UniProtKB/Swiss-Prot annotation:
Function: Secreted subtilisin-like serine protease with keratinolytic activity that contributes to pathogenicity.
Originating species: Coccidioides posadasii (strain C735) (Valley fever fungus)
Upper lineage: Eukaryota, Fungi, Dikarya, Ascomycota, Pezizomycotina
Keyword check for Cell inner membrane: no
Domain called Peptidase S8: residue spans: 127-410
Transmembrane regions listed in the UniProt entry: none
Location of the protein in the cell: Secreted
Annotated protein name in UniProt: Subtilisin-like protease CPC735_003880
Propeptide: 18-118
PANTHER family linked to this entry: ALKALINE PROTEASE 1-RELATED, PEPTIDASE S8
Principal localisation: secreted
Annotated GO CC locations: extracellular region
Any Pfam family the entry gives: Peptidase_S8
Length: 410
């Protein structure tokens, strides 16, 4: 969240030297995300769905009758309702897409596109990161934290799934939801297990007693907004239906080129009382060019090294809210119930702050996402980031333990 501002996807690879591919290459031909205007009724929505189905059938029939090549498209795929935002994904021929764009109920018709995870890089030496979170940004290999440790808090991980049987989760991991048909809930890629471990693993986690819930939208290093909207829609509904807004945080270590419909979804979740933490991206550029980093009401996290220098790969700029460790980090992996790996990336930085949010929610009464963000920023340590990048805030995440009773883990 950009506090005090007006207010496909690729998993973030754990670090990649490669920037996000060009927008044209990432567009999915014939696939769209359609957002509807604010204020329409449920009756309007049902009428619109029927209208789209009718227009789609008519256009396909007209193409056949005229002897034009007919692109077999399925029409509306999934419908999403995220607080006040109504949207749907669909596969349409060009004429139907244009007809939908002109419909008076429609706000936007945007081509679906790939979203990426951050690439994984294996490096030697790890372990400073948790000490960093409790030592005001200074070098330490001792992690100090309140013994509540995120207990009673739910952290939703929109990613590749979670290795829920990993011993580090101690039974506190749940498969949650899978947006990808004909693919198991299992984490086959590792990225989701790694980020979940930074949030809540007993050894590697910031909030060691929190529960992590998977919302699977990726099975490899890339996905599309069709799946990501579906998974995020489930997360928002699951949190709001259970009344857990003050006890839940969402982590998304993902990135694509700027995609306004999904930024709008994050902002609507914020209005519904949900805190979302996201990665700034690994493209060495202004994060305002990336989604969901550019969402006004996400907490956007950039990466620092062991020495508090901004990571060379990390995005930067005014949409960044805070920095957290993102290099030489060890966490949970796949391939066994005790597997681990080391990795770099803003994908790694984001769950440090998601874990911090879970940690703070367990010990303080934070009534809404604005209060959560303010508390995270108020606790942060200023002026230690070297070369934060043009427009970036100079703030490092800190858990505030020196102002609280503490438990010491050597």
């Amino acid at each position: 969240m950009k506090l005090l501002k007006s207010s496909l996807l690729l998993l973030l690879p754990f670090v990649t030297a490669n920037p996000i591919p060009s927008e044209d290459k990432d567009i999915i031909p014939g696939r769209y995300i359609v957002t509807l205007k604010d204020g329409i009724t449920q009756e309007d929505i049902e009428y619109h769905k029927s209208w789209v189905a009718s227009v789609h059938r008519s256009n396909l029939a007209a193409a056949t009758a005229a002897g034009r090549p007919r692109l077999e498209t399925e029409g509306i795929r999934k419908f999403f309702q995220i607080h006040k935002m109504n949207a749907y994904s669909g596969a349409f021929d060009d004429q139907t897409a244009e007809d939908i764009r002109r419909n008076p109920y429609v706000k936007s018709v945007t081509p679906d596109r790939k979203v990426y995870l951050a690439d994984t890089v294996v490096q030697e030496n790890a372990g400073y990161n948790l000490g960093h979170m409790s030592s005001k940004g200074r070098h330490s290999f001792t992690y100090r934290y309140d013994s509540t440790a995120g207990e009673g808090i739910w952290a939703y991980v929109l990613d590749t799934g979670i290795n829920v049987d990993h011993i580090e989760f101690e039974g506190r991991a749940d498969s949650g939801y899978n947006a990808i048909k004909n693919v198991s809930n299992t984490d086959n890629f590792g990225h989701g297990s790694f980020t979940a471990g930074i949030i809540a693993a007993k050894t590697y986690g910031v909030a060691k007693k929190a529960t992590v819930i998977s919302a699977k939208a990726f099975d490899t290093g890339s996905s599309t907004y069709d799946y990501i909207f579906d998974a995020y829609n489930w997360v928002v509904k699951n949190i709001t239906d259970s009344g857990r807004q003050k006890k839940s945080v969402v982590n998304m270590s993902i990135s694509s080129a700027k995609y306004q419909p999904f930024d709008d979804a994050v902002d609507n979740a914020f209005e519904a009382g949900i805190t979302t933490v996201v990665a700034a991206g690994n493209d060495q550029r202004d994060a305002s060019n990336n989604t969901p980093a550019s969402a006004a009401n996400a907490i956007t996290v950039a990466s620092i090294r062991f020495d508090n220098g901004r990571s060379l790969f990390s995005n930067y700029g005014s949409v960044v809210d805070i920095f957290a460790p993102g290099e030489r980090i060890v966490s949970c992996w796949i391939g066994g119930n005790n597997a681990t790996r080391k990795a770099d990336g803003t994908s790694v930085s984001s769950p440090h702050v998601a874990g911090l949010v879970a940690y703070l929610m367990a010990i303080e009464d934070l009534p809404d996402p604005a209060a959560v963000t303010k508390r995270v920023l108020d606790l942060s340590i200023p002026d230690l980031v070297r070369d934060p990048g043009e427009g970036s805030p100079n703030r490092i995440a800190y858990n505030g333990i020196q102002e609280m009773n503490e438990t010491v883990i050597a």
